[in-house]
């Protein structure tokens, strides 16, 4: 926001000096020494060029004053804020097409097609091994971990009383 206010103050400060120039008078150009300016008595073509330059600058200044950008345009130029139209209609269409049609309407390059095929081959080769390797883990969980967890829960709730008394365990449960 500080950048925007600085830009605005710089343009406001520089606009009145240029706007005060008339189209008929030559614009004062910055020069390093006053001797380089043409003398008004000597006949030369530079005053004519200076008049043309000042007329062009005057018309540009009028265009600048007439076309002040809005705050939204300034924010868009700096990239702050989000706008719906910046996403583009093409992106919206591809998402819509993928939801309805799957990948039937998607155009793939050769590299994308090759990567997809390699991925499908990798899944086809490794999936049966992963499915069979999950069975021992499931059986261990059902046979050992689940019964121990259920017994611990019943003891903690007080449904099952232990035949011995340990003060630490009693304090922990209660």
Swiss-Prot record:
Give me the stretches of Low complexity compositional bias: 30-45
What membrane topology does this protein have? Single-pass membrane protein
Which compartments does it reside in?
Answer: Plastid, Chloroplast thylakoid membrane
Q: Which GO terms describe its cellular component?
A: chloroplast; chloroplast thylakoid membrane; membrane; NAD(P)H dehydrogenase complex (plastoquinone)
Q: What happens when the gene is disrupted?
A: Impaired chloroplastic NAD(P)H dehydrogenase (NDH) activity, probably due to a reduced stability of the NDH complex.
- Biased composition of type Polar residues is found at 14-24, 53-64
Q: Which keywords does this Swiss-Prot/TrEMBL entry list?
A: Chaperone, Chloroplast, Membrane, Plastid, Thylakoid, Transit peptide, Transmembrane, Transmembrane helix
One record GO biological process: photosynthetic electron transport in photosystem I
Membrane-spanning ranges = 140-160
Tell me if Chloroplast is a UniProt keyword of this record.
yes
Region (Disordered): which ranges?
Answer: 14-71
Transit pept. (range): 1-54
Annotated function: Probable subunit of the chloroplast NAD(P)H dehydrogenase (NDH) complex of the photosynthetic electron transport chain. Required for both formation and activity of NDH. May function in assembly or stabilization of the NDH complex.
Q: What else is known?
A: CRR3 is not conserved in cyanobacteria and seems to be a subunit of the NDH complex which is specific to the chloroplast.
Q: What is this protein called?
A: Probable NAD(P)H dehydrogenase subunit CRR3, chloroplastic
The protein's organism comes out as Arabidopsis thaliana (Mouse-ear cress)
Gene name on record? CRR3
